[in-house]
């Protein structure tokens, strides 16, 4: 069990607007990049291959292919440096860590997509 004083201090630094996503989801992370005195937002889009827990130390790893080369980036979940995390599609995977995607190429490296239920026409017209 962690010390209550440490938990109280850490709670101040946790983000309240964290997007819910899981391993296998396709996400777009809008990350603030500081270049000199200017600050701009850079988007990084890929598949979440790992999530770690740990209050303010929680991280997630996103993998994408850029010009045929695999690029992975680790993001702190509670960092003030990102603007938002967009979930583009939900992935249907049976594992917590998808490191096996590193060895796969082409169509084999795809993750099955969960189809989100669309509202029926009757329900849409009734409201």
From Swiss-Prot:
Molecular function (Gene Ontology), one example: structural constituent of ribosome
Q: What Pfam families does this protein map onto? A: Ribosomal_L19
Q: Which keywords appear in this protein's UniProt record, sorted alphabetically?
A: Ribonucleoprotein, Ribosomal protein
Q: Which PROSITE patterns match?
A: RIBOSOMAL_L19
Which SUPFAM superfamilies does this chain map to?
Translation proteins SH3-like domain (SSF50104)
**Record-level GO cellular component terms:** cytosolic large ribosomal subunit
BP term (GO), one: translation
Family, per the entry?
Belongs to the bacterial ribosomal protein bL19 family.
* Record HAMAP family: Ribosomal_bL19
Query: What does this protein do, in the record's words?
Result: This protein is located at the 30S-50S ribosomal subunit interface and may play a role in the structure and function of the aminoacyl-tRNA binding site.
What's the name of the protein?
Large ribosomal subunit protein bL19
Q: Which gene encodes it?
A: rplS
């Amino acid at each position: 069990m962690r010390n209550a004083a440490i938990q109280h201090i850490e709670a101040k630094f946790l983000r309240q607007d964290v997007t819910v996503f899981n391993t296998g989801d396709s996400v777009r992370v809008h990350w603030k990049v500081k270049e000199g005195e200017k600050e701009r937002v850079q988007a990084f889009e890929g598949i979440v291959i790992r999530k770690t827990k740990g209050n303010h130390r929680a991280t997630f790893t996103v993998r994408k292919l850029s010009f045929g080369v695999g690029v992975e980036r680790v993001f702190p979940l509670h960092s003030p440096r990102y603007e938002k995390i967009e979930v583009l599609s939900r992935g249907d995977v049976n594992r917590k860590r998808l490191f096996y995607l590193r060895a796969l190429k082409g169509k084999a490296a795809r993750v099955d997509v969960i189809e989100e239920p669309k509202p029926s026409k009757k329900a849409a017209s009734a409201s």
